[in-house]
Every structure is written in structure tokens, then in C-alpha cells.
């Protein structure tokens, strides 16, 4: 068998090759007229890929499906069970072919947050140690709001000619999750985001977008260090 040069390249710790980073977003979901339907997937993929470049960990790509709360209907999503099964399938394949022993899931879609309840099941079924990183969700603000618009500007995926229409909430009620009354009543954070968009509107700031992305990337890099320090599976 060929002996791999695990110390080759800009690699500070050869054990980083045993860590995988994979994006989890949403590919089929409305974000207002200024943002593409796969905004969450593209943002999560950028964060995961950049963290992979900077850390040396393996970039595993992106999970295709996404989950959403039943009271929020702004896209095409799957059940939590189906999402869990898909993650298990993908990670089993990555473990088999890439010899990883732990994974960081970079989550860029709030509707995926319930996956935290199935992480133990995913670990048991894959034999991998899993870290779920949702830093960007914690930082970006309302759905389709200034945070996502600014990151989209930094990534070059925004239609700036449509920003002025982003707060036409009668037509694009998914922005800020404004039109989802039940979700707003059930979750104070959703209600706060909806009111923020309604009362304050949105803006685009390239520097702010870059700062949000860097904050999220650094958070993933910290998770890589934690996995290395804990000697996960090594």
C-alpha cells in the first residue's frame, strides 16, 4: 500500500486529514427577489470550503436536502427523518473512502436546527464524532435580511437591482418570515426578525458581509482545533 505524505503541503497537524467538513444549507427556498433560492447552501458551502482550505481538513461538499418547521412554507424541504438518513448515507461514504473519524457540519439554514436532536443517532450509525456548527445562523439576522444580503454581496450572488423590492412584504412575505404568523407566535426570535424587517427595512454592506463570513469561518476553525485537541478517534 502506498504511504501517503500526510505532512505535505501547508498542514500544521497531519491528524487534520481525519476531520471532514461538510455544508448543510437549503437549495430550494425563497429568499425574496434579491437572493437566489439556494442562498443558504451557497453560504454554508463557502464557509465550509474556506475553513477546509485554512485548516487542512477534508472538504466533503454539501448535503442536498434540508428540513424546515411545518409552519414555515417557503420552499421544498424534507422530514427530519429523511434528512438524518441522507446525512448518515453521505457520511458513511466519506468515512469509507476518505478514512475520516470526525466531521463538522456547517449549517447555514435555521430550519435544519432540529437536527441537533438526531446527532447522537448519526454518530451511532456512522461511527463518527460529529460537531454541528450553526454560527452563521446565530449571527446573520432575519431570513433574507441585511445579513444574508450583505454576505450575498460579498459572494457575488445578489441581484442589487432588486434590493429595493426585498421589503415588499406583501409580495415577498418570506423575508423576515413575515407572513408566517404561527411561526412568529411560537418563536420570539422569528417575531423579532419579522418586526425588524418590517420596521427597519434592509441594507447591503459588503464589509459587513465579509465580516459575517469570516466570523463563521473562524468558528469552524475553532471546532477543528477542538477536535484535534480532543484526539477524536485518533
Curated annotation (Swiss-Prot):
Pathway: Cofactor biosynthesis; coenzyme F420 biosynthesis; Cofactor biosynthesis; riboflavin biosynthesis
Annotated gene: arfB
Purpose of the protein: Catalyzes the hydrolysis of the formamide of 2-amino-5-formylamino-6-ribosylamino-4(3H)-pyrimidinone 5'-monophosphate (FAPy) to form 2,5-diamino-6-ribosylamino-4(3H)-pyrimidinone 5'-phosphate (APy).
Note describing how the cofactor binds: Requires one Fe(2+) ion for activity. Requires an additional second metal ion that could be Fe(2+) or Zn(2+).
Cofactor: Fe(2+); Zn(2+)
GO molecular function: 2-amino-5-formylamino-6-(5-phosphoribosylamino)pyrimidin-4(3H)-one formate-lyase activity; ferrous iron binding
EC number: 3.5.1.102
Protein name as it appears in the record: 2-amino-5-formylamino-6-ribosylaminopyrimidin-4(3H)-one 5'-monophosphate deformylase
Species name: Methanobrevibacter ruminantium (strain ATCC 35063 / DSM 1093 / JCM 13430 / OCM 146 / M1)
EC top class named in words: hydrolase
Amino acid at each position: 500500500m502506498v504511504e501517503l505524505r500526510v505532512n505535505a503541503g501547508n498542514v500544521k497537524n497531519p491528524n487534520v486529514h481525519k476531520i471532514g467538513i461538510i455544508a448543510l444549507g437549503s437549495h430550494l427556498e425563497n429568499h425574496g427577489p434579491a437572493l437566489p433560492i439556494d442562498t443558504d447552501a451557497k453560504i454554508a458551502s463557502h464557509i465550509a470550503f474556506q475553513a477546509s482550505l485554512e485548516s487542512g481538513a477534508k472538504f466533503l461538499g454539501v448535503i442536498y436536502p434540508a428540513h424546515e418547521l411545518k409552519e414555515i412554507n417557503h420552499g421544498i424541504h424534507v422530514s427530519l427523518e429523511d434528512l438524518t438518513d441522507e446525512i448518515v448515507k453521505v457520511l458513511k461514504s466519506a468515512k469509507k473512502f476518505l478514512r475520516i473519524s470526525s466531521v463538522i457540519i456547517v449549517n447555514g439554514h435555521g430550519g435544519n436546527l432540529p437536527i441537533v436532536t438526531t446527532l447522537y443517532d448519526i454518530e451511532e450509525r456512522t461511527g463518527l464524532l460529529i460537531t454541528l456548527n450553526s454560527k452563521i445562523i446565530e449571527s446573520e439576522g432575519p431570513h433574507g435580511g441585511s445579513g444574508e444580503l450583505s454576505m450575498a454581496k460579498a459572494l457575488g450572488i445578489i441581484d442589487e437591482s432588486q434590493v429595493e423590492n426585498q421589503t415588499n412584504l406583501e409580495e415577498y412575505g418570506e423575508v423576515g418570515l413575515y407572513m408566517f404568523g404561527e411561526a412568529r407566535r411560537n418563536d420570539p426570535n422569528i417575531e423579532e426578525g419579522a418586526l425588524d424587517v418590517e420596521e427597519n427595512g434592509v441594507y447591503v454592506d459588503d464589509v459587513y458581509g465579509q465580516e459575517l463570513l469570516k466570523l463563521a469561518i473562524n468558528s469552524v476553525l475553532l471546532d477543528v482545533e477542538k477536535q484535534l485537541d480532543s484526539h477524536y478517534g485518533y
